[in-house]
Amino acid sequence: MSKIRVHEYAKKHNISSKDLMTKLKEMNIEVSNHMTMLDDEVVNKLDNEYQAEKPSVADEFEVEEKVVRSKKNSNKKKKKGKGNEDKRQENFAGRQQTQTVETPDKITFSGSLTVGDLAKKLSKEPSEIIKKLFMLGIMATINQDLDKDTIELIANDYGIEVEEEVIVSETEFETFIDEQDDEENLKERPAVVTIMGHVDHGKTTLLDSIRNSKVTAGEAGGITQHIGAYQVELNDKKITFLDTPGHAAFTTMRARGAQVTDITIIVVAADDGVMPQTVEAINHAKAAGVPIIVAVNKMDKPAANPDRVMQELTEYELVPEAWGGDTIFVPISAIQGEGIDNLLEMILLISEVEEYKANPNRYATGTVIEAQLDKGKGTIATLLVQNGTLRVGDPIVVGTSFGRVRAMVSDIGRRVKVAGPSTPVEITGLNEVPQAGDRFMAFADEKKARQIGESRAQEALLAQRGEKSKLSLEDLFQQIQEGDVKEINLIVKADVQGSVEAMAASLRKIDVEGVKVKIIHTGVGAITESDIILASASNAIVIGFNVRPDVNAKRTAELENVDIRLHRIIYKVIEEIEAAMQGMLDPEFEEKVIGQAEVRQTFKVTKVGTIAGCYVTDGKITRDSGVRIIRDGVVIFEGQLDTLKRFKDDVKEVAQNYECGITIERYNDLKEGDIIEAYIMEEVKR
């Protein structure tokens, strides 16, 4: 008999991998994960164990009979009791009325209470409370608001404890959108999967192959509507795939605080190996903290070498299970549809072990996958429901937009009325187009949804989206002191691989006040827009060694407020990071020439010195600028302006093509033909 894996045995005997692993531990048999091999001896032990637990047919029949009998009895009891139910309720209500109202031990309130409200909560007459307030020197009417201190004073007089409830504003629903539900309300949901990888390694082909071979039963041959996400079914279990365009969308969502993906599939071509975008995808997935499955594609090619792919990926801490690691590698051929079932089974296996759950019995919350404006339908948004159930007609707030769900379309183009957890749907009915990554929440009341949506839109105008504080070396020390930073994320780019490794190794050794450096991505070549997007999503600082950012990277860094540091000497990088962490980073200044003036004539004045009659030939000369005197192309003096005049008046600046009078501090040897160059020192944005 050949060896069998844990998950294969579980599948064969119709039990979950998790239950089987628990059983093995009870039997004192160590297994590391669901891919562990079981030998013949262990398999025999398990067979005996499960055989012993299995009830006989007679037992099963007896149990079933008891259940049926108990159901019948309960129905009889219900019938008997039905006639007297109203009488019992009347008697109970009567008894309640005759009972005296007891004083509570504790009351709760939020904000303030009126005298009448406080009297109700304390089970007292309002006149009694007014009398007590009068005794305290407070003249109050029944509708007058009382502050927290007064409420506590009155309640304490009756020996009643007071608790103030802090109400979280529903406008900021992101703060409580991810609150954990009670365990008994949670039910299994499909896993949400994102496919990433290098260009031309077969991401799109894999998505198409999965979609075409595994559309839900009855939909084969139907036109699949592209809504940015879709579901497939295998063994009566669903999997949701996000068809996000590239890594940028993935990180943009993460930058907005939306964690939509449960599992990431990294596609690597067997004939091409690990490429720059593959590494990028790995770092994006690691930064998101989700399980990774490696799909080794193009196995049908003659040059396919899966061992090489495995070897290369071990450098990025993705060690295959066959080599003692815990990363699942699945060989596939997307174009021929080979290995697709195995890949989907691995996704279901991870789902089973991770136990992805949500509460379907609440108002829906989730994330926008994509959105657009359609001429005929208006605003169309693809939403991924992450918790709760979304229904047609639900009032909804999406980012800063709001509305009522007018219509819902599934990934196969069918109109649906409800969408549960992990279901992607396209909706209409919003007042404006939201952004990918915006969170949404359904509400019971349309008026409330409108009010919250308008408030959020107003707040967004006051504080522009994306202006959240990004980590920079200037404020690093302050953030460390305030306890905001426990780990510094860095992205390292250099001109050669040797420099990358040397710099990363040196940076990892830095440890100041328990704050450590974490390198989230390294690479060779110019700093790209993709690096900046990853830095923005992960709140990281980008360090370039002998490389520069390209035009798009510069523009994106300015928009996202990402700190880029460029260096030519490794120890300077280390010194700068350490200095920043210790709060000793000095600001860096850069000289900027703002203008030049030519000396046309000189005048010697007693007690004043030499006055130069000048003509501004370029830019401008300002009163607070530094100056240098240039004679025959050589700088002969550097200092400060003493006076700057137009005719007899002191002025702050003189523009190009105007004349002026200039005196220089502690320098009188000015001659006709000298050039006075004005400059200022500007702090460099690092």
Curated annotation (Swiss-Prot):
Region spans: G1: 197-204
Any one GO CC term of the record: cytosol
Residues binding GTP, per UniProt: 197-204, 243-247, 297-300
Molecular function, one GO term: translation initiation factor activity
CDD domains hit by this protein: IF2_eIF5B (cd01887), IF2_mtIF2_II (cd03702), mtIF2_IVc (cd03692)
Biased composition (Basic residues): 69-81
Region (Disordered): 54-105
Region of interest called G3, as start-end residue ranges on this chain: 243-246
Keyword Membrane attributed: no
Annotated region (G2), positions in chain: 222-226
Protein's UniProt name: Translation initiation factor IF-2
Native source species: Bacillus anthracis
